[in-house]
Amino acid sequence: MPQHDQLHRYLFENFAVRGELVTVSETLQQILENHDYPQPVKNVLAELLVATSLLTATLKFDGDITVQLQGDGPMNLAVINGNNNQQMRGVARVQGEIPENADLKTLVGNGYVVITITPSEGERYQGVVGLEGDTLAACLEDYFMRSEQLPTRLFIRTGDVDGKPAAGGMLLQVMPAQNAQQDDFDHLATLTETIKTEELLTLPANEVLWRLYHEEEVTVYDPQDVEFKCTCSREHCADALKTLPDEEVDSILAEDGEIDMHCDYCGNHYLFNAMDIAEIRNNASPADPQVH
């Protein structure tokens, strides 16, 4: 049976190593449902969703993380944004033919991974790593070694459960300021690598952890729900319209009679007529009606 989208944190009592396990199905389906992506693009977004959830769970503060793939390939952009409450959204842009069995480098071409961390309070941090690994997991492991000098392993699996897209992943990381033995970390990584896609996507988290680590002492913490949530709003659209030259806005109104702002993440449409624009320019709140 497919599990509810959740993230589980766990800790090895005898090693200075922490872990995370996440499975997503409903959240992934909501990200994909408003778009007709080729299967390889769906797979990349699934991997990005898992990776972003795992990375967001490493935050020690309120804020969000955006994990973005950019390049000159036929999929020139893929991005997932998530916050410390495990609220996720994402989108991809395709500008060319996608081979049926395209791998990551074929999709992105010459590109890189951008990780942007935005605390609710404090300065934003951005890290960039070249798309040198063969997988997203390998690229992100490289990011952790360069930016935080913390040995980190990611294990990401994608597939279908009951005919619907699903994905899951696990993260192992040496605890900051701890001296975990490399042999111990490698041992745990070797165990984790054996997880089968079907097991990860269909079994309860506690059973997965027992199958992998039944000879180790593991503390598992209360799970956190993962969900799709878009941050778009009529107010955000109004703020965006304020940044456009009046002439450009008036030209669209004259030609179309209204301005239709579409959210790529969730598919919502926000309509603004001439009266709405006048209210925006007068710093009043635009009328409430909204079309989905």
UniProtKB/Swiss-Prot annotation:
Transmembrane segments: none annotated. It holds the Pfam family HSP33. Disulfide bonds join C230-C232, C263-C266. Belongs to the HSP33 family. It comes from the Bacteria. Under oxidizing conditions two disulfide bonds are formed involving the reactive cysteines. Under reducing conditions zinc is bound to the reactive cysteines and the protein is inactive. One of its GO terms (cellular component) is cytoplasm. It comes from Shigella boydii serotype 4 (strain Sb227). This is 33 kDa chaperonin. The keyword Cytoplasm applies. Gene3D superfamilies: helix hairpin bin, Hsp33 domain, HSP33 redox switch-like. InterPro entries: Heat_shock_Hsp33, Heat_shock_Hsp33_C, Heat_shock_Hsp33_N, Hsp33_helix_hairpin_bin_dom_sf. Redox regulated molecular chaperone. Protects both thermally unfolding and oxidatively damaged proteins from irreversible aggregation. Plays an important role in the bacterial defense system toward oxidative stress. One of its GO terms (biological process) is protein refolding. Its main location: cytoplasm. GO terms for molecular function: protein folding chaperone; unfolded protein binding. Keywords: Chaperone, Cytoplasm, Disulfide bond, Redox-active center, Zinc. SUPFAM superfamilies: Hsp33 domain, HSP33 redox switch-like. It is found in: Cytoplasm. The keyword Cytoplasm applies.
